[in-house]
């Protein structure tokens, strides 16, 4: 059993046994009913990527390719355009969060409001981060924040769930490692937990490659970790499943010091991944 599988089962059990019920919940199911959930607060996990510990479960298949494409949409394309996400990456699940009548920051008609990539572009976040790490890798101010009150007031739109990432550099002997800490305000445990974690591991790997560093540790903090009330059967099924014997790893197949903006989604490869099947179905809360 991988570390991710152990943490996954522990979190599911804790939510089901100790979680409290949401109140005045915002999300809705497609039929318009309120999407209530059981949740815990203050969830934390640590993975040492350099030792092959990756935050992806083997208890069900995870759509890692489309998840990584979303990282490129946000941090390379730096746009909120649904047209770019669909036409360039063939990713469609963000359509449910379209904000009607709000054009994208690149002029396209369809957008998710002034969120995610639009905020990255507005503040030139990636270029500033890379320049800061270039000037002094050991500085303690390497922060990506997507929490922009001005943007929230400007347009409607889903406020970012994974909203802050911090980076630190460590030298161990002759090797330099890049660590990352992801802070998330809210996480759908069964659907999005490993997707979000692996997305930001991919971002960490892209930045490390840019400088020729090794990937180090990945820390994951979630303020509100929940399971929706239409997912309890799937939760019980996941607890019954026996994980596969594989130890999946994400690999970035580009040379060291490849420019961040030259890396492509197809450069990533998930190896030794043989998840338990069949896939489970989930009705999303929007």
Curated annotation (Swiss-Prot):
Transmembrane feature ranges: none
> What does the entry give for GO biological process?
dTMP biosynthetic process; dTTP biosynthetic process; methylation
Q: Which UniProt keywords apply?
A: Cytoplasm, Methyltransferase, Nucleotide biosynthesis, Transferase
Entry GO CC = cytosol
Which enzyme class? transferase
Annotated active site residues, numbered on this chain, are 161
- Where would you find this protein in the cell? Cytoplasm
Q: Which residues hold (6R)-5,10-methylene-5,6,7,8-tetrahydrofolate? A: 188, 285
Q: Pathway, according to UniProt?
A: Pyrimidine metabolism; dTTP biosynthesis
What GO molecular-function term can you cite, just one?
Answer: thymidylate synthase activity
Q: Which residues bind dUMP?
A: 140-141, 185-188, 196, 226-228
The record's section on InterPro entries has: Thymidate_synth/dCMP_Mease, Thymidate_synth/dCMP_Mease_dom, Thymidate_synth/dCMP_Mease_sf, Thymidylate_synthase, Thymidylate_synthase_AS
Where does the source fall among the domains of life?
A: Bacteria
Free-text function comment from the UniProt entry: Catalyzes the reductive methylation of 2'-deoxyuridine-5'-monophosphate (dUMP) to 2'-deoxythymidine-5'-monophosphate (dTMP) while utilizing 5,10-methylenetetrahydrofolate (mTHF) as the methyl donor and reductant in the reaction, yielding dihydrofolate (DHF) as a by-product. This enzymatic reaction provides an intracellular de novo source of dTMP, an essential precursor for DNA biosynthesis.
Family designation = Belongs to the thymidylate synthase family. Bacterial-type ThyA subfamily.
Subunit structure as annotated in this protein's UniProt entry: Homodimer.
Which PANTHER family does this entry report, sorted A to Z?
THYMIDYLATE SYNTHASE 1
Q: What name appears for this protein in its UniProt entry?
A: Thymidylate synthase
Q: What is the lineage of its organism?
A: Bacteria, Bacillati, Bacillota, Bacilli, Lactobacillales
Record gene name? thyA
């Amino acid at each position: 059993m991988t570390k991710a599988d152990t943490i996954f089962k522990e979190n599911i059990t804790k939510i089901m046994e100790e979680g409290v019920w949401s109140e005045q919940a915002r999300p809705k199911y497609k039929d318009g009913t309120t999407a209530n959930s059981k949740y815990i607060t203050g969830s934390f996990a640590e993975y040492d990527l350099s030792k092959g510990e990756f935050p992806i479960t083997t208890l069900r298949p995870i759509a890692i390719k489309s998840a990584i494409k979303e990282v490129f949409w946000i941090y390379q394309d730096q746009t909120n355009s649904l047209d770019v996400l669909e036409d360039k990456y063939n990713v469609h699940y963000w359509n449910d969060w379209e904000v009607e009548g709000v054009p994208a920051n690149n002029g396209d008609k369809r957008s998710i409001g002034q969120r995610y990539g639009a905020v990255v572009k507005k503040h030139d976040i990636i270029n500033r981060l890379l320049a800061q790490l270039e000037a002094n890798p050991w500085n303690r101010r390497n922060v990506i924040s997507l929490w922009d009150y001005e943007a929230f007031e400007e347009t409607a739109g889903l406020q970012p769930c994974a909203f802050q990432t911090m980076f630190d550099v460590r030298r161990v002997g002759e090797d330099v490692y890049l660590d990352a800490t992801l802070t998330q305000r809210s996480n759908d445990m069964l659907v999005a937990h490993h997707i979000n974690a692996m997305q930001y591991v991919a971002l960490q790997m892209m930045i490390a490659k840019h400088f020729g560093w090794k990937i180090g540790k990945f820390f994951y903090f979630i303020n509100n970790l929940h399971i929706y009330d239409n997912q309890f059967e799937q939760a019980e099924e996941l607890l019954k499943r026996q994980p596969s014997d594989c130890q999946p790893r994400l690999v970035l197949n580009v040379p060291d010091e490849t420019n961040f903006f030259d890396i492509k989604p197809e450069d990533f490869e998930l190896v030794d991944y043989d998840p338990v099947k069949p896939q489970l179905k989930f009705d999303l809360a929007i």
